[in-house]
Design a protein with these regions (language model features):
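Feature of multi-pass inner-membrane transport and sensor proteins
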Residues: 1-26, 285-302, 329-359, 367-452, ...
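Interfacial "coupling" helices/loops that link adjacent transmembrane helices in transporter permeases
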Residues: 20, 271-315, 668-710
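N-terminal membrane-entry
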Residues: 250-267, 356, 647-664
Length: 784
């Protein structure tokens, strides 16, 4: 065969595509959807990374590591390192806001830093670094003082002295300052040292390091440790920024990387299965066409190349369309999140183009189509010239003995199962498509659970406002809780007592953190129990208590804790609590038990939940009441904005995940509908013969339903079996190890999966059956 003839065969590709436009429509749609899915997922991930990078730079600063406990000489050498872009010393006073530093009447934290701090924290708006006697102040100071650049503000020191500082600029990141109803003053190190010396306040100096772009962050950190003998304990990482650069050595972040890689891989596999199955079905129903080409003299290699290039010809329109659809959907989702969800999405790019998403989507389409066409191409090349006369070759559809025994006299059911299982590859592709969709559903359902555990403001006990005495001692009068509860704006007010106690447990001695709960807090804690029960009345001189799961806390139900003159028994374990984890086990008891053990009956902290978190007047009223009652010796925390942002993030996350799962479910349904439709088209003559020899409409429906049902059942069995294993592993990795909650079979998810699969079967059967029944039997017979 000459090269000229080969070219003439390949010239049939655009002609065939034009003639078979309707038949190829579903295959092209599958490619479009697969490319769209991957493009949208990776583009959205890229946009989210850009947003989080911007947010973290503004909130936590543009630094990679912070080093402490080093000499000035070592600090100077670090600043001169080739891979270091920005280096700044940093010291603070009253970061805990427990000392009496006031700017006006608001508590103040003081920061002393080098000029380079402006490069570390982009939110600081100042043309030049503060000079002696000047400060950068958090912008929330403008809420109660008429302050502009150049205005002098008074700073009251703990010894009662007042000094005047000039405002040189503002720090627009006020989230932490607003939460604690305070301001942060940033000054140069000379001014800072003078103030510290004046009040005889000691401080520690730390050093922020920002590495140059395209630096191997992990290697640079290791080099610093080795060269200067700095231990890991002296180096703190900016975890979020390092994670966004895929450079974090945090075990939990590394686990999230692995989870993301697995889920991304399954998304890609879902697209591969869909494209491969569609091309395989398309080629199967055109066997007679390839047989005709063999009659005209085409060789096997020519037919093989024809099939591959024909598949790539579909990509000419399908890949750009899929990428465009993915980009537009990303724009729409970003615009929705930015406009309607919350301020935390304000830095999300609305019309951003993601090269990563486009490259991944295009590569998936082209590479998958090329390799997916390989097997059908070999199959088409095997078509003998006689196929052109006998029609499309269909795998042996004869009923196997096992099918006959299974369905007895129901020959149509046996035939349907045989049609599904006669092509092992097609069965594998359909089963894989179903199974992957189920795997994705069960995997992403774990992420939804993880968000609920990870975000504390979503919990029932999350306060809107909190107040604690500056010393952190139990000095808040319980009467104050009653006064707050009596306010019409307050939904709940509740307090907690706290006391560290020496104890002996599990054969070792060590401190415990004893904390009290009232009735309403125990009610909330009930749903967080992962073992045991809530504490009841003391028995035999033993006080029942709860503990909180933590990897460093080995206490479990039944353990006893011996105090100096009392014994506690752990009767329950919680997976979560409002408290930050410490090296000491958290032990929770009733207020009465706390009083009997410590003799104290006042609170260390009072939390407040409001009926309307948007009522600024109510918040101001409560703030005034607390400040007047406690003579301003309190740390007042306003968590409303932070809670609102996290709740918005929670719902946005759910929205994105559910939208993704809906797309996956839709693609799965489309895939089986397409495959059943193509299978019916390939066997159209066979169905005509069956109708001619007496098969009625009901039997025909049952036969095609049996074929679709076989795909569904095999997909359900494989998908649920593998999905439950993966669901359990992800749950243990993300939740059990960190929150203590035990894995349980997700019956709700399984029920949804079964319903979706049954819906796919019903939709897959409807159109092919209607098409067959509309075709006259004589039309089929006349073609034989």
């Amino acid at each position: 065969m000459s090269s000229t003839e080969m070219k003439s065969y390949l010239s049939l590709i655009p002609i065939s595509a034009k003639v078979r436009r309707r038949q190829n429509r579903m295959t092209i749609l599958c490619i479009v959807l697969a490319v769209f899915l991957v493009t949208a997922v990776f583009s959205m991930a890229d946009m989210a990374i850009r947003m989080e990078t911007s947010n973290q730079l503004n909130k936590n600063g543009n630094w990679h590591i912070m080093v402490k406990d080093i000499s000035p000489e070592t600090a100077a050498e670090l600043a001169a390192q080739e891979d270091v872009a920005v280096f700044s010393a940093y010291s603070d006073i009253n970061a805990s806001l427990t000392e009496n530093y006031f700017a006006g009447d608001k508590r103040a934290a003081l920061v002393g830093a080098d000029d380079a701090i402006l490069q570390i924290f982009p939110g600081m708006q100042c043309s030049t670094a503060p000079a002696d006697g000047e400060v950068l102040v958090t912008a929330n100071i403008r809420d109660w003082l008429d302050v502009t650049v150049g205005t002098a503000i008074p700073l009251t020191l703990p010894d009662g002295q007042t000094i005047s500082l000039t405002v040189a600029g503002f720090n627009e990141d006020t989230s932490d300052a607003n939460q604690y109803d305070a301001v942060v003053l940033v000054m140069n190190r000379s001014t800072f040292s003078q103030i510290a010396a004046q009040v005889e306040e000691s401080f520690e100096t730390q050093y922020f390091i920002q590495f140059k772009p395209r630096t191997n962050l992990r290697q640079s950190i290791v080099n610093i440790e080795n060269k200067y003998g700095i231990s890991e304990e002296k180096i703190s990482e900016n975890t979020y920024l390092m994670a966004l650069n895929a450079s974090s050595n945090n075990d939990y972040i590394a686990g999230l990387y692995a989870v993301a890689a697995v889920l991304a891989g399954m998304v890609v596999l879902a697209g591969i299965f869909m494209i491969t199955g569609s091309i395989n079905s398309n080629v199967a129903q055109r066997t007679s066409y390839y047989g005709m080409l063999r009659c005209l003299g085409a060789g096997k290699n020519q037919v093989r190349m024809l099939v591959r290039l024909e598949a790539l010809f579909w990509c000419k329109t399908a890949v750009p369309a899929g990428c465009l659809l993915g980009i537009v959907s990303t724009w729409g989702l970003c615009s929705f999140l930015r406009r309607f969800i919350g301020e935390e999405f304000s830095s999300l790019p609305v019309l951003g183009i993601s090269p990563v998403g486009i490259i991944c989507g295009s590569a998936l389409g082209l590479i998958t189509v090329w390799f997916a066409a390989s097997s059908p191409a070999r199959r088409a090349a095997k078509a003998s010239p006689i196929t052109a006369a006998t029609g499309n070759a269909v795998e042996n559809a004869a009923d196997s003995p096992c099918h006959a025994r299974l369905f007895g006299s129901r020959a149509e059911l046996s035939l349907g199962v045989s049609h599904a299982t006669s092509s092992k590859k097609n069965l594998l592709l359909m089963t894989g498509s179903f199974a992957l969709s189920i795997l994705l559903f069960l995997s992403f359902s774990v992420l939804l659970r993880w968000v609920g555990f990870a975000l504390n403001p979503l919990q029932s006990y999350a306060p809107d406002l909190s107040v604690a005495e500056t010393s952190g001692q139990n000095v808040l009068d319980p009467v104050l809780v009653e006064q707050l509860e009596a306010l019409p704006e307050v939904k709940h007010a509740f307090g907690r007592m706290y006391c560290p106690l020496p104890a002996e447990y599990q054969g070792k001695q060590g401190p415990i953190d004893l904390i009290s709960y009232d009735t309403i807090q125990f009610g909330w804690a009930k749903k967080d129990l992962i073992g045991g029960t809530l504490p009841q009345e003391p028995e035999d001189g033993t006080y029942p208590v709860l503990t909180v799961f933590d990897k460093s806390n080995s206490l479990t139900v039944g353990d006893t804790i011996q105090l100096e003159d009392a014994k506690l028994t752990v009767v329950g374990v919680l997976n979560d609590s409002p408290f930050s984890s410490t090296d000491s086990p958290i032990v929770i008891c009733t207020e009465e038990t706390f009083h009997q053990l410590t003799g104290q009956n006042r609170y260390a902290v009072i939390d407040i939940q409001l009926k309307d978190t948007t009522a600024d007047a109510a918040i101001a009223k409560i703030h005034t009441l607390l400040s007047d009652t406690l003579n301003k010796q309190v740390v007042f925390s306003n968590r409303i904005e932070g809670n609102r942002m996290i709740q918005s993030t929670y719902w946005a996350f759910h929205l994105v995940v559910y939208a993704f799962l809906i797309v996956i479910a839709g693609i799965t349904i489309l895939n089986i509908v397409n495959s059943i439709s193509m299978s019916v088209s390939a066997r159209m003559k066979q169905y005509g013969i069956l109708r001619a020899i007496g098969m009625d409409d009901a039997q025909l429906k049952r036969m095609i339903s049996a074929e679709a049902g076989t795909y569904a059942v095999s997909g359900l069995v494989v998908g649920i079996a593998l999905g439950l294993v993966l669901n359990r592993k992800l749950y243990i990795l993300l939740i059990t190890h960190y929150f203590g909650a035990a894995w349980q079979v997700p019956w709700g998810c399984l029920a949804v999966i079964v319903v979706v699969v049954l819906a796919a079967v019903v939709l897959a059967v409807y159109n092919p059956v209607r098409r067959i029944l509309m075709q006259p039997i004589t039309a089929t017979i006349s073609e034989l």
